[in-house]
From Swiss-Prot:
Transmembrane segments: none annotated. A lipid is attached at C206, C208 (S-geranylgeranyl cysteine). The gene is RAB6A. The modification Cysteine methyl ester is found at C208. This is Ras-related protein Rab-6A. The modification N-acetylserine is found at S2. GTP binds at residues 23-28, 39-40, 42, 45, 71, 126-127, 129, 156-158. Mg(2+) binds at T27, T45, D68. GO terms for molecular function: GTP binding; GTPase activity. Its EC number is 3.6.5.2. Keywords: Acetylation, ER-Golgi transport, Golgi apparatus, GTP-binding, Hydrolase, Lipoprotein, Magnesium, Membrane, Metal-binding, Methylation, Nucleotide-binding, Prenylation, Protein transport, Transport.
Amino acid sequence: MSAGGDFGNPLRKFKLVFLGEQSVGKTSLITRFMYDSFDNTYQATIGIDFLSKTMYLEDRTIRLQLWDTAGQERFRSLIPSYIRDSAAAVVVYDITNVNSFQQTTKWIDDVRTERGSDVIIMLVGNKTDLADKRQVSIEEGERKAKELNVMFIETSAKAGYNVKQLFRRVAAALPGMESTQDKSREDMIDIKLEKPQEQPVSEGGCSC
């Protein structure tokens, strides 16, 4: 019955910003999720790209706005403004590149500087299809996630491994249901605010 009530509510939008060093696979993860495809030709993201997708969960439907940021240093100054109003940050590293893993601490710090501690952060070790070239163990990823109090998953955008699971876990952590209920409460308060304004008039005048 509560699901039926949700149909009247506008589709909730959540902004997810993808962060990480250059060539860790941010764009590839988004492309795999959006189109279930993978492009072997590497093209660096210039500035910021934006894509949007509706996601159907068990108890609600939401719209994810995916912001793909460039990893290059020259675009770094653009990123804080995109982090500022995000609901979640996906911080990606390449399991075959230990430097990209070390840099995730800085990216997570940037997110918390702009958004405070209430933002959802997912640490993602990408490129598990290159396991023979692995420089960062899954245990190291899990340890860092625990230390920094963030979520963690390993993925392969190329093989499609855990990509849907990544987005499902982030979506499940979003404050969708609470926000929807708060919205309804706000609407109810708005209605109540109009009634008290009428009451003093009827009490002060004739009781019609």
